[in-house]
Amino acid sequence: MAVFKLDALRAIDMSKLCFAISLLCAVAIATFLHKLYKARSFMRRLQREGMPMPPHHWLFGHIPVVAKIFGTLPPHAHLFFIADQVRQAYPHLDSAFYLDIWPFGPPSLMTISPELASQFTQDKSLPKYEGVRKFLKPLTGKKDLVSMEGHDWKHWRANFNPGFSASNITNMIPAMVQDVQTYRDIIRRHAVAGDIFPLELPTLAMSMDIIGRVVLDHEFNSQKAYNPLTSALIDQLAWCTIGVHSNPLEYINIARPIVHQYNAWRMNSYLDPLLKLRYETVNQRPKSKYVGDLIMSAYVKENSPDGRPTKMDPVFAEFMRAQVKLFLQAGHDTTAASIVYTFYMLQKHPESLRRLRKELDTVFGPDITATCDVLKEKPQLLSQCNFLLAVTKETLRLYPPTSTARFGLPGFYLTDSDGKRMPTENCLVVANHHGIHHNPRFWPRVEEFLPERWLVDESHPLYPVKNGWRPFERGSRNCLGQELAMTEIKLVVAIMIREFNIHDAYAENDLEKGQREKNLRVNGERAYQITRGGGHPSENFPCRVSLVANKEREIP
């Protein structure tokens, strides 16, 4: 009898469990269907109102359109290609369009017009998209400058600005030259060896060393030896995909939080004693313009009655770690990729290369071995290289490293040149830099590399459209480090380009790997940008490097 009762109780418990599971599944399905209906009906309403968008399916939304486009692109092609690909497929969508890919993302309003992008970044600054914060959280804990809004953001942005000003960055050029010299020595060894190597990897290490100097006045020596902080930060970035990827499997990777915690511990173990020492001695550097010192000085001034640093508050220590990690990430990632693309563009356009080398001979003298010494003595000479600036800007036009994602507000509309008002409420609003920079409606000879467009006057057909160039975004929340990035790109190119010829080796690399080249291009471009934070050259840009022969430098 007792056994019978026990079996009955077990059967009852099992039935309750099955009922609970069934109920949870029913609730989950009902919730999913409700959200699906809400997303699709919202977009169908916009479609009925004449809002611009590709063909919309009542059940699948724009998922078939997006899937078809990405089916034609190579693996890991950057997500920001979608805007230009949609424009090519539907030429009438040449200013903005809505996309509905729920459950892979919220309803989106994609802008590829300078005028429309300026309306929500310059005329009014919409709040940052929550996905950006989710992406950065494992790295910074959501306490960084990018994640801030309102008064906190204004306060700290004002404190950071002097550290990234043009004059301050120019003063740091002599220190930056040291890291570029190390980089030059590494590239020279590859030139002598004649091997194929991924150019972006040593470039990333150099950029990390430079941003370490600018932020902390600290030598990471990432180019020469293993550094635990930079290694952990790069590894953490590889695992920071939540918020920017649409793959739902990214959300159920059980290893992710473990890796995040481990890398955070590695970074904090390196940073904490370094920051503690800088904080305790900050008053010994009253005129320091290093970014870390600026943050600490502002905090001491506001929180210490006698103006002297006391014990570092744990909350402020966490805040400091967040800013340093953010600046290290932002200061090396996209800049390194842009340097590589600048070399690539010059390789593909020998006339521009010859003109640039001639300008550098004029500004720094014909002795290429003296370039570094000249820059250390007269760093302001870099600003006299007008064609170098034009080359840099044109490269960033063709290969913008990021885009801008904001979130719409009730009652806020974007208005196109025809007077059409597009609602932003409940929408991810994107200024797609790649789509804007490659839009033939706004750029004559849009796919051509033409540094000259940055040197002509307003009456010339090539003169850039107002607000059209936005690799660092525009408006109050533009990239804080754009002056550093532009200076670093120009500095590296000025030192390297007269000594080395850098040629991509994709054909050899593909042959060696047995890859079918026809499946590895975007708009005919093999060095297409891939998703890894910002846009990076595919496969880290395999290349060969050779030394420039004397006859190559005999420029008429």
Curated annotation (Swiss-Prot):
Cofactor(s) required, per the database record: heme
Applied uses, from the record: Polytolypin and biosynthesis intermediate compounds show antifungal activity and can efficiently inhibit the growth of the pathogenic funfus Candida albicans.
GO MF annotation list: heme binding; iron ion binding; monooxygenase activity; oxidoreductase activity, acting on paired donors, with incorporation or reduction of molecular oxygen
Keyword Oxidoreductase listed: yes
Pfam families the record matches: p450
UniProt keyword annotation of Transmembrane present: yes
Membrane topology summary: Single-pass membrane protein
Compartmental location: Membrane
UniProt function note: Cytochrome P450 monooxygenase; part of the gene cluster that mediates the biosynthesis of antifungal fernane-type triterpenoid polytolypin.
PANTHER family linked: CYTOCHROME P450 (PTHR24305), P450, PUTATIVE (EUROFUNG)-RELATED (PTHR24305:SF107)
Protein name as annotated: Cytochrome P450 monooxygenase polC
Gene source species: Polytolypa hystricis (strain UAMH7299)
Gene name for this UniProt entry: polC
